């Protein structure tokens, strides 16, 4: 009788999916990674929209955020899931490690004030493809050898779908009704965002730190599985570390001198080009195909957040915590002098 575990045997196997037990499992991992990126993207859009709605001078930016189509988000989700499915765990692990090193270097060099907050938000926007790769690497490593791997991934996909739909529903609610509800003190969700939206980047930062920590551990473990001796591992990790360090130094200087979307595209080309040259010497031929897929995935994610990247370049954005107006209390009336008539 036809059953779910026999389904992958009818599907063609892809050599690039070497750490996945089947194409179905790799597809599930790609969908989970894309849904994780959807949650991050939706919450960032909520934060930016609230910041624009609280500032009357940001009305054009607010209308740009509101004008984005939901159908394009669905296409973006499907395309990202496809890239994460076919990229391969080895290249995904390299992408995660490269971004983690760049993120640590950027966070250590951040300044204080609004400029540091804008750079932190920009880092959150640029980590989307790397986050998807980190989630797929973590799932591939944690579910390796599990007796019910496909069932576990299906349950994880269900949870990720609930989180993604909830984040998208919150984004739509805020875009449609936040201004009305926050002005009339009507909705608890909108009032919570009015008072505490400034803390949303900190919450996202903690969640991303946990996700990338798990992804980095899984990436190192997955890469080390290919090496039989310590000398082979050293021949791989030594040029990789040197290449990553030089890339980080170059990209930080380039972004500070030429901020903007064009600079981010050039940074992606330099990153993927450096990994391509590195894997020509210590990698495999299929890894080179994965680098090309990663290049398309990075550019795909940049296209989806170009509006938010433009907002990060605006001076004094994000704005500080908006003042919450308190209802005016009536002034105490002056005591009236009562004249007592003599009886």
UniProtKB/Swiss-Prot annotation:
It comes from the Eukaryota. Residues 334-343 have a biased composition (Low complexity). Keywords: Membrane, Transmembrane, Transmembrane helix. The chain crosses the membrane at residues 30-50, 77-97, 121-141, 145-167, 203-223, 233-252, 263-283, 285-305. Residues 320-343 are annotated as: Disordered. GO terms for cellular component: membrane. Pfam families: TMEM82. Residues 320-333 have a biased composition (Pro residues). Signal peptide: none annotated. Its main location: membrane. It is a multi-pass membrane protein. It is found in: Membrane. InterPro entries: TMEM82 (IPR031648). Belongs to the TMEM82 family. This is Transmembrane protein 82. The lineage of its organism: Eukaryota, Metazoa, Chordata, Craniata, Vertebrata. The gene is TMEM82.
């Amino acid at each position: 009788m036809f059953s779910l575990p026999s389904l992958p045997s009818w599907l063609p196997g892809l050599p690039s999916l070497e750490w996945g037990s089947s194409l179905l499992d790799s597809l599930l991992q790609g969908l989970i990674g894309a849904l994780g990126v959807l949650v991050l993207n939706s919450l960032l859009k909520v934060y930016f929209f609230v910041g624009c709605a609280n500032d009357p001078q940001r009305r054009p930016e607010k209308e740009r955020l509101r004008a984005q189509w939901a159908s394009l988000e669905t296409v973006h989700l499907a395309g990202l899931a496809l890239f994460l499915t076919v990229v391969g765990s080895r290249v995904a692990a390299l992408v995660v490690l490269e971004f983690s090193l760049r993120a640590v270097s950027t966070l250590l060099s951040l300044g204080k004030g609004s400029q540091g907050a804008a750079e932190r938000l920009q880092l959150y926007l640029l980590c989307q493809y790397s986050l998807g790769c980190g989630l797929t690497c973590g799932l591939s490593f944690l579910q390796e050898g599990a007796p019910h791997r496909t069932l576990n991934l299906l349950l994880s996909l269900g949870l990720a779908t609930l989180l993604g739909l909830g984040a998208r529903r919150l984004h739509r609610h805020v875009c449609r009704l936040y201004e009305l509800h926050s002005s009339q003190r009507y909705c608890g969700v909108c009032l919570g965002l009015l008072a505490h939206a400034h803390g949303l980047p900190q919450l996202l930062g903690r969640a991303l730190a946990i996700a990338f920590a798990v992804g980095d551990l899984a990436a190192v473990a997955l890469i080390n599985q290919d090496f039989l001796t310590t000398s082979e591992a050293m021949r791989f990790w030594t040029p990789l570390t040197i290449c990553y360090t030089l890339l980080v130094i170059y990209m930080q200087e380039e972004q500070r001198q030429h901020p903007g979307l064009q600079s981010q595209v050039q940074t992606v080309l330099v990153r993927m080009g450096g990994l391509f040259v590195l894997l020509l010497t210590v990698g495999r031929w299929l890894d080179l195909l994965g680098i090309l897929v990663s290049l398309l995935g990075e550019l795909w994610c940049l296209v989806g957040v170009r509006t938010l990247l433009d907002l990060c370049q605006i001076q004094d954005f994000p704005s500080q915590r908006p003042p919450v107006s308190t209802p005016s209390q009536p002034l105490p009336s002056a005591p009236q002098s009562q004249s007592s008539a003599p009886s």
